[in-house]
Regions:
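A structured beta-alpha segment of the ubiquitous adenosine-cofactor-binding alpha/beta core
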Residues: 1-7
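Short, structured coil segments at secondary-structure junctions
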Residues: 6, 26, 93, 169-170, ...
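Residue-level signal for inorganic ion chemistry
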Residues: 10, 75, 139, 191
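ALDH superfamily catalytic-core signature
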Residues: 19-125, 176
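Short, well-ordered beta-strand elements within core beta-sheets of diverse protein domains
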Residues: 72-74, 125-134, 149-154
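A C-terminal functional module that forms or caps the active site or interfaces directly
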Residues: 150, 154, 159-170, 178-180
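Internal helix-turn-beta structural module
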Residues: 171-172, 180-213
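Conserved small/polar residues in nucleotide/adenosyl-binding loops
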Residues: 218-222
């Protein structure tokens, strides 16, 4: 039965299949997200210790939440020693790593071979895909192609690259030197939440240019 006279909006709270089914069948606006394919990009100029700590938290603090990092992107000029330390940190915490060819050549241990499917997989588990990119532009292109506009983070000491990343990724929440798991309402100062929306529409009332502009939440850490 059509319930549009009684229900203004639906906010599904549950697993991926529930949210997908509600979005497919619902005749009223739906607020929410289907998947959280979140990324962390490590630039070539970073605080090495901070990068390791942020990546470990972003992936392993709670692997089953939508804000967990599922893909790690690494600048091609990031020191090989640092890449090995980060990946070893993940492996030592029982994280299964799916890596592209370039990463597998750099890392001294055994890694699983990444496929195209891995770049669009929300693992919700102790698993992560890792890819080498040539610059921040390629990182942004990868995120906008495979991501779900949830939460994505750049780790860098370069303010120009940080600003480019923040302005060009399409995510609802954009991080600089911050774990993607720092994305809930309480942590951002909004109090309790019923979900995280990746929607850009709808506006209400007269629709002009301002009403057609969406926003992103930007979180910057030192």
């Amino acid at each position: 039965k059509d319930m549009r006279n009684y229900i203004d909006v639906m906010i599904p709270r549950g697993g991926k299949n529930l949210v997908k089914k509600v979005k497919e069948l619902c005749n009223v606006p739906v607020i929410g997200h289907l998947e959280g394919i979140c990324h962390t990009f490590i630039d070539k100029k970073v605080n090495a210790k901070m990068a390791r700590n942020v990546v470990l938290n972003a992936k392993m603090r709670n692997v089953s939440i939508c804000g967990a990092t599922e893909t790690l992107l690494i600048h091609k000029d990031c020191p090989k020693k640092e890449i090995n330390l980060i990946l070893n940190e993940l492996k030592n915490n029982n994280c299964l790593i799916y890596a592209d060819k370039k990463v597998r050549k750099i890392f001294s241990g055994n890694l699983k071979k990444a496929t195209n499917k891995d770049w669009s997989t929300e693992y919700l588990d102790s698993k992560i895909s890792v890819k080498i990119v040539k610059n921040v532009n390629e990182a942004v292109q990868h995120i906008n192609k495979f991501g779900t506009m949830h939460t994505d983070s750049i780790i860098t000491n370069n303010p120009v690259n940080a600003n480019y990343f923040i302005k060009n990724v399409k995510s609802s929440i954009v991080m600089h030197n911050t774990s993607t798991q720092f994305a809930d309402g309480g942590e951002l100062g909004f109090g309790g939440e019923v979900g995280i929306s990746t929607n850009k529409l709808p506006p209400r009332g007269p629709v002009g240019l301002n009403q057609l502009v969406s926003l992103s939440l930007i979180h910057i850490s030192e």
